[in-house]
């Protein structure tokens, strides 16, 4: 049994890395279609109006809330991102759970962001408003 695990483990690891790579690429395309207008190509948003996604302390501290914002349409009330207050509500984009996962994987691995967490469709699907 141990030999089977040793044999299959590299394929499992490769498969995870490969699926993340595909998710990030799909997320990039979706970001360009749905997010770039407000958050800009560099993910920096507009200070005080549109929160940044690049180097965002909020994304890491409030991961689930960030995903819910994408899934259900914004966050109610004021948030503070990198020390700056924001109080504008993002529209619901109408993305499917797998697309939300892809966009989040792209955001979490772009513009200097690096996450070892893979957001999956199943994870997004379980989130309730």
Give the residues covered by each predicted segment:
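The canonical Cys-X-X-Cys-His
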Residues: 27, 31-41, 103, 107
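Hydrophobic residues within well-ordered, non-membrane alpha-helices that form the packing/core
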Residues: 10-11, 31, 107, 128
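A contiguous binding-surface segment within folded domains or other stable secondary-structure elements
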Residues: 37-78
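Electrostatic cytochrome c docking/interface patches
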Residues: 13-30
């Amino acid at each position: 049994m141990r030999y089977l695990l040793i044999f299959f483990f590299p394929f499992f690891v490769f498969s995870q890395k490969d699926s993340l790579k595909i998710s990030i690429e799909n997320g990039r395309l979706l970001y360009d279609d749905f997010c770039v207008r407000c958050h800009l190509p560099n993910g920096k948003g507009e200070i005080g109006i549109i929160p940044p996604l690049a180097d965002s302390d909020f994304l890491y501290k409030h991961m689930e809330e960030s995903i819910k914002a994408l899934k259900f349409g914004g966050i109610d009330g004021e948030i503070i991102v990198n020390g700056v207050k924001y109080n504008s509500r993002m529209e619901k984009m109408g993305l499917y759970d797998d697309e939300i996962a892809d966009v989040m994987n792209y955001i979490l691995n772009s513009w200097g962001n690096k996450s070892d967490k893979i957001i999956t469709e199943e994870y997004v699907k379980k989130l309730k408003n």
